[in-house]
Amino acid sequence: MSRGTLTRRNVLKAALAAAAPYVITSAALGGRGLLSPSERIGMGFIGLGGRGGSILSHFLRKGVSEPIAVCDVWKSRTDAWRQRLGDGVTAYQDFRELVDRPGIDAVVIAAPDHWHVPISLAAIRAGKDVFCEKPLAPTVREGRALCQAATRYGAVFLHGTHQRSFGLFRLACEIALNERIGKLHTIRVCERGSWADKVRPPQPVPPELDYDLWLGQAPEIPYAGQALHGGMWQCRSDYTAGWISGCGVHPLDIAQWGNGTDRTGPVEVEGRGVYPRDGFNDTACDWHVEMTYANGVKLIFTSTHNDVNSPEVGARFEGTEGWVMAQGNASSILADPPSLLKTVIGPGEIHLARSDNHALHFLECVRSRRETVAPAEVAHRSTTLCLISDIAMRLGRKLRWDPDKEEFPADAEANRYLARAMRAPWRL
C-alpha cells in the first residue's frame, strides 16, 4: 500500500493563513500598540544551562513580557545572562530568592529534572504562573503533588512538551480521535535511547557552583565534574528516570492526546530494558514496553538506541482502516492511505486545543487565565507513562495499574517506586 507524507514546510503558508493569531486585547494596549510597562508580564528564569538558555529568548517578547530576574546555581551563567539582558535584571543563585521577589508574574523552569516539582511548587505557592520543562517529575507522587498545588492556587501551568504546538501533530491526533483510520487498536511510540558511561572519579567543586543546592533533595555524592554540568545527569536515577522520560515523554504525550486518554492512563504495563552494568549512568539505554488501556488500545513503546534520526521516532496510530503517524524528528505526518493527509476536521467533530507557538501560548494564557494546551494534570499523566514503564522493566514482570488511584493494586513492591526519600532539609 502507498503512503503519504505531509511536512511542516509543505503547509507553512496554509498554516499561517489558518492559524488563530496570538492576541493581547486592545484594552490592554498602550498608544503605540504595546502593553504598558505596568501590564507587561514580569518573567523570572530558573536554570540557564543548555536547554534553559536556548528557550529563554522565546519568552522575551518585546512589549508583552519583561525579564526581571535570572537564576542558576552556576554564578558564571547568571552573570553572563544579566550582562546580556541589561542592568535592570537581577541575578540569583538560589531559586527561593527569585520566586519570593515581587514583580515576577511567571517563571520558566529549566533546571535538572529532580528540581522541576520543588521549584514549581515554590513558585506556585508564591503566586507565580509556571512554564516547566519536561519531564514533569522523577516520581509519580511528586507529579501528583504539583497537580494539587496548581489546582489549589489557580496557577497557569504549561509543560515543555512543545509538540502539542505542532499543527501537524494536532491534526494526526484529530484524525485518530475522529476515527478517520477506523477504530484505533494500536499506538506505536518510539524514541531514542541513551548510553552507558564510565566510572567518574570525584572532582573539586568549582568555586562558582553551589553544588549542595544543585543536589538539593538528591543523595549526596562527590562532584562528578563534566558528568553533571555536561548533561550526563539525565541518565542517572538520582535525578531522573533517564531518557525514557527525558525524551520519551514527547511521543507518549502525543499518544495520550490522540487516544483521548491524556487525563488518565493504561491499566497494564510490562516491559524489558537494557541497563548499564557499571559507571555513572544507571538508567535504561534501550527498552521495549507494552501497555494496555481500558478501551482496549495497545501502546507499544520502544527505543532506537540513541538514533535521533530514526524514521521510527514518533507516535503512530493504527486503526482498522489505516494509520497516521506524527513523525517526531521530521515534524511531519505520514499516513496510509495518503488521502488521510487531506483530512479536514468538520465543525461537528472533535477539535483539540490549539497552540501554534509554545512560548507565546503560555504568555497568552497568563494574561487570559485560560488553561494551557499542556496543563499540570496532562503533564503528570504523560510523565507517569514513562515512570511506570521504568518500574515494570526494573521489576521484570507485568504490572496492573490503577490510573484513578495512581497505584499498582495489591503490589507493595511496585508501589515502593512511586515515591522516594528526599535529602534533608528538603521536602515537598
Residue ranges and their predicted role:
Residues 1-18:
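N-terminal secretory signal peptides and thylakoid transit peptides that target proteins
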Residues 13-37, 282, 365-428:
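C-terminal helix-rich "cap/oligomerization" subdomain common to oxidoreductases
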Residues 14-86, 163-166, 255:
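N-terminal Rossmann-like dinucleotide-binding module
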Residues 47, 180-197, 210-224, 267-276, ...:
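NAD(P)-dependent dehydrogenases' Rossmann-like dinucleotide-binding region
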Residues 117-165, 179:
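Beta-strand-loop-alpha-helix segment that lines the small-molecule cofactor/substrate pocket
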Residues 148-155, 171-186, 203-205:
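Basic phosphate/pyrophosphate-binding loop/patch that engages nucleotide-derived ligands
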Residues 212-295:
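Rossmann-like dinucleotide-binding domain that binds NAD(P)(H)
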Residues 287-356:
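NAD(P)-dinucleotide binding in Rossmann-like oxidoreductases
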